[in-house]
């Protein structure tokens, strides 16, 4: 039996923890499963190891959070800092203007119209120029930095949060933008890609497919008539 240190973590636990921590944009659950089985044997599970890690990390306000992709259901693991201001913490390598821009982008995404939870490059440039006086070339450079570091993702010029950003910002978004949020009634996570019925029942795209419900289980309205959340 491997000896545990004073913090309650064995060397194998610490190895897996470091593996997850070093991948700041998150790590695929399947990769961690393979690593766990290499270290502990084929009967070991990711769930058990992560639970053991979280029991120790809890005392230091850290957590490993499992996130399910809202479109395809792929599971990733993310290291979370649960204390302080998550926006400042996630942006510590950045100068103040980038931290402020990130705060603004979070606000604009959360408050955008028509359930879109996303912004075009042009929208970000216009808002940034109006509220912060930043030139388009500067904004574009900052956006690609946020994309490179795993906080924002873009497809065809449309920007939204990554799974890692949603994991890191979960408490912050609930505290600051509770009235602008939708939560999936299946998995209880924030929805930026999904459907909301007129009755208020809400599902991620993946959760809706996985459950295979043709109609809303709350009011029996066809999901085909639901409002789409996000641009995907």
From Swiss-Prot:
InterPro entries: Nse1, Nse1_RING_C4HC3-type, WH-like_DNA-bd_sf. It is found in: Nucleus. CDD domains: RING-CH-C4HC3_NSE1 (cd16493). GO terms for molecular function: ubiquitin protein ligase activity; ubiquitin-protein transferase activity; zinc ion binding. It catalyses: S-ubiquitinyl-[E2 ubiquitin-conjugating enzyme]-L-cysteine + [acceptor protein]-L-lysine = [E2 ubiquitin-conjugating enzyme]-L-cysteine + N(6)-ubiquitinyl-[acceptor protein]-L-lysine. Its EC number is 2.3.2.27. GO terms for cellular component: nucleus; Smc5-Smc6 complex. A zinc finger (RING-type) spans 181-222. Transmembrane segments: none annotated. One of its GO terms (biological process) is DNA repair. Its main location: nucleus. Keywords: DNA damage, DNA recombination, DNA repair, Meiosis, Metal-binding, Nucleus, Transferase, Ubl conjugation pathway, Zinc, Zinc-finger. Belongs to the NSE1 family. Acts in a DNA repair pathway for removal of UV-induced DNA damage that is distinct from classical nucleotide excision repair and in repair of ionizing radiation damage. Functions in homologous recombination repair of DNA double strand breaks and in recovery of stalled replication forks. Plays a critical role in meiosis. Two subcomplexes smc5-smc6-nse2 and nse1-nse3-nse4 exist. These subcomplexes are then brought together via a number of interactions, forming the Smc5-Smc6 complex. This is Non-structural maintenance of chromosomes element 1. The lineage of its organism: Eukaryota, Fungi, Dikarya, Ascomycota, Taphrinomycotina.
């Amino acid at each position: 039996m491997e000896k545990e240190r004073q913090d309650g973590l064995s060397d194998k636990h610490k190895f897996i923890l470091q593996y997850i921590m070093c991948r700041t944009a998150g790590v695929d659950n399947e990769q961690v499963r393979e690593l766990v089985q290499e270290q502990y044997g084929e009967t070991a599970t990711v769930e058990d190891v992560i639970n053991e890690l979280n029991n120790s990390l809890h005392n230091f306000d850290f957590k490993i959070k499992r996130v399910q992709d809202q479109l395809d259901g792929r599971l990733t693991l993310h290291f979370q800092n649960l204390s302080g201001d998550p926006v400042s913490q996630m942006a510590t390598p950045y100068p103040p203007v980038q931290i402020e821009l990130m705060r603004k982008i979070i606000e604009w995404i959360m408050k955008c119209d028509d359930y879109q939870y996303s912004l075009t490059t042009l929208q970000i440039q216009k808002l940034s120029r109006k509220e912060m006086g930043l030139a388009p070339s500067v904004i574009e450079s900052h956006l690609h930095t946020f994309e490179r570091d795993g906080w924002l993702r873009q497809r065809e010029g449309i920007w939204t949060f990554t799974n890692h950003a949603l994991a890191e910002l979960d408490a912050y978004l609930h505290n600051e933008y509770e009235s602008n949020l939708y939560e999936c009634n299946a998995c209880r996570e924030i929805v930026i890609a999904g459907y909301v019925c007129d009755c208020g029942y809400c599902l991620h795209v993946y959760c809706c497919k996985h459950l295979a419900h043709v109609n809303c289980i709350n009011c029996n309205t066809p999901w085909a008539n639901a409002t789409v959340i996000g641009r995907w």
